[in-house]
Structures are given as C-alpha cells and as structure tokens.
Amino acid sequence: CLGIAMACKVPLFSGIIAGVIGGIIVTVFSGSKYSVSGPAAGLTAIVLTSISQLGSYEAFLAAVVIAGVFQIILGVLKAGSIGNYIPNSVIKGMLAGIGIILIIKQIPHLFGYDKDPEGNEQFIQMDGENSFTELVHMINFITPGAIIIGLVSFAILIIADKPFYKKDKILSNLPGPLLAVVFGILLNLAFKGYALLEISPVHLVNLPTIASITDLQANLFFPDFSFVNNSKFWIIAFTLAIVASLETLLGIEAVDKLDPDKNESNTNKELLAQGIGNIACGFIGGLPVTSVIVRSSANINSGAKSKLSAIIHATLLLISVLLLPNLLALIPNSSLAAILIMTGFKLTKLTIFKEQWKFGFEQFLPFIVTVIVMLVSDLLKGVCAGIIVAIIYIIKDNI
C-alpha cells in the first residue's frame, strides 16, 4: 500500500485507505472467495498522468468516484464475462510473470537496498534504474544484518511449508509469514548497537503516524468535482474504469486458477464490488483499487478458507496504522522481501513452464510472450501481447 502510494507521489495514507477499503468493503460485495483488493501497481502510470493533467489530487479523486460508477454500470451490463475469453496459457503466463517480477523486485530489499519503493512492480523505477540494473547497482549497498534476517525468514518459511509442520496441532496454528516477521523484529532489536549488523531506519517499514483525530483529518482528502465540465476529466475517469476493470478480471481469472477448491467467481458481481470500493476510495482520499494477484495468491498460500481472511487482514491493517505504528516500524523490509520471494517461487514453478511446453508450441508461445513482455513493461501490456499471439494462432488454425 505504502510503496504504491510513494510510486504515485500521493500522500502515504492514501495507500492505507485503499488497502482498508479494498479489504473490507470490496470483499463484502465481492464475487470471489479469495480475491484481495487494494491499490494496484499497474495503475501507477495512469494515476501520475491523471493528477498532472487535472492539476490536483482532489480533482483526481473525483475521477475515481466517477470511474467507480462506470464499473457498477459495467457490472450491471454483465461485462464481467469478458474474463472468460482470456486464454488459459495467457493467464498461466501472467501468474508466472508476476512470480518472476516479485522475485527480481524483492532481491534488493532482501539485501538491504530499498531505493525502489516496496510494492512497485514497474520495469522502469523511480530511482532511474530498471528491474535488472537494480540487481547490479545494489551490490554496492549490501547490508549484512538485512541478509541474515532475510535468510532466517527464508528458513522459517521453508520449514513452515513442510508436511510435518502443517500436520502438527500446535505448529499448524502458527503461520510461517507471521513467525518470519516476529523473528525479523527480534533480530532487528538484537542487532542494535552492532555497527556491522544494525538495520538503518530506512530499511524498516515506514508508516504515517496518526496520533490524534487532527492527524487523521489532515490525512484525509476529498474529491473536487469542479472539473466535470472538462473533457479530460471524463476521459481519465473512463480510462481508470476500463483499466481497473481489466486488471480485476485478470486477477479474478488468476485467483480461480490458484483456488484449491476450484470455485468459479462471479465476475459481474466483482465489477459491482470494485465500483463500490472505488466510489468509497474517491470520497475519502484513497487510491483506486483493483483485485491484486500478489495479495490474493498470498491469501490462498496462507491457508485462507473464506472472505473473512481478507476482511481481517484489512481490519488489522487499519488497527496497526492507528494504534501500533511504532511496533510495525520495527519490521525489517528483508523479512517482508523473503515472504514475497517465496510467494513468487510458488507462482513461477519450473513445472508450469514444462507443462506449457508439453501442451505444444501453440500454448507455449502465448505463455512465454506474456512472461517476457510483462518483465520489460507491465502486466496489461504482457497480457495484451499474449492474447494477440493466441489470436494469431486461432486465425491460422481456421484458415
């Protein structure tokens, strides 16, 4: 949430608002059992451009409200069925691509180099590097303490994924990611005073401090509808609605593929939920929300059984920001990086590549094109490239 807010150059609390609304309001109305919604990295470029064109964040929030109305209309018109036509190979490629991006993006954080905001998935980064050059650049800024915390977190996550751990009555109630974070905090405290190992504050979770009602009010922004007579305003609102809806439909299709129970989500209901969520975000200063594949896959991998897990996640996020900011500020980014890298490995297993290859070149090419284009651009461009390749094969087979 915070990393995306930083990448969008908006108040940090705007990301928190989006995470809370996405986790509670959207989840309540959602047509998916496991989808988790929140601010999306894929909308970063649109947010930056839109704020620049409209001249203020408040005017942009008004566009988010109207975008939410458009999404509700799309849901009523049953536009959610579009997601059913996305080729399976492209969905698999999207998941594998996200997994690789997660791994590449989190390696610098694991080593204690945090120039690129946590949560930013764009190829071209805010610090002027790209996803690959960052890996070379970080070598000069390695933090030994961060590496130790990251490796310990990895060890905990690997052990927590073993059958003996999952079958034990006591251990099975202790989620691996939670233990990794707890041990990360303890090691961070233990390293204090040791110059070589001590973790600098810039390598720790950074939350906005809300100490009073006045602080809360200062972090809330409200929409300015004075631009409704401007054609740019409506173009931005419509663009937001379409892109956010496409990301959501892609996310829902991906979640259904990951769902161990193979539930089929109601995509039209999901568009309605996203619309309601974006209207709420726009009215109190939150970034636009979509279904977020990384959050959703982490939700499934953590053993979620119902919508309640997403609601609890968002509630804890809100409580933590309001009541426990000092405790959360002790969490090392390297612990979180280890958790996300493990999620990435689960999304991009070698078996997925072998499976797509066995299905033949007509399945493998859209899959691998989706992965490659995603790595050097973004999710939507990768999916569009994969769909185009899949369509070419369909036309070729029917000539």
What are these regions (language model features)?
Residues 1-398:
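Transmembrane helical cores of multi-pass ion-transport proteins
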